[in-house]
Amino acid sequence: ELAPIVLFVYNRPEHTRACLEYLERNELAAESELYVFADGAKSGSEEAVAAVRRVIAEPWKFKRLNVVERPENKGLAANVIAGVTSVLETHDRVIVLEDDLIVSPYFLRFMNEVLEVYKDTEEVCHVTCHMLDHKGELPDTFLIRWCNSWGWGTWSRAWQYFEPDGRKSLREIERRGLCWEFDLDGGFHFTQMLRDQIESRNNSWFIRWYASLFLRDKLMLGTGRSLVDNAGFDGSGTHCNTMQLCTQTLSMNPIAVVPISPVKENLLARKVYSRTYRYNYSYRHKLKVFIGNLWIRVFNRKKR
């Protein structure tokens, strides 16, 4: 049995259409059950939300389409937590996407193979095939003590570890002196992100999920090439019209799933992730992207 796909959508009809079109091109799409959780409208977003719901009501080519239209706006975090929890009450595994993601034709094959191969491997609790552009060679698949929320999968056996109380997780991370490791060895301020969630400066489900698994020494299976691209940084609605802090190249070749032994973290992958995040969010790189986008806007004005 194939893993059900769970898609979270809100107010971006064109992103939603692109996500579904790319997903539909996968050879396993017609054999897969799709759950769509459509969040309710905030004031002023009614028209866009209605447009999204018209898109998902079209005749898509999946085995079965289950649509949950929220009557109120839950917000992404609450929608993801409730949606994943409900699907895992009747299935033992799940593949999760958000509306700004587009996937390779080999995405579903890879995710289903990994979810089957590692279904009884307790140390592995999270799966992704998204990878940022990076320097340095990585194997096709590897294990790392981290999480990636852009096109991921998990099992009901792992989701039971989810701790929604970020304060409890932060307290334990600090008590054990693990802030540096939690920050990907200084690569990104994930500890501060967790603090911000606690103080309601963000409402991230991801940071709480990452903390939940990190504190239990659980691993993610990741890939050296990306079968997922995040199209949500387009700004104006045209993906190629802006420079991005984080870039990824969508691979159009399959990734073989070979069981990794021994089951332990790949330290090279950890180093590459840390270095990539440190560079992408450095002031130097941010300035470069800012200037690049400024020039793009000036050039576009001149063309008009």
What is the role of each PLM region?
Residues 1-96, 101-304:
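An acidic/histidine-cluster motif and surrounding catalytic segment
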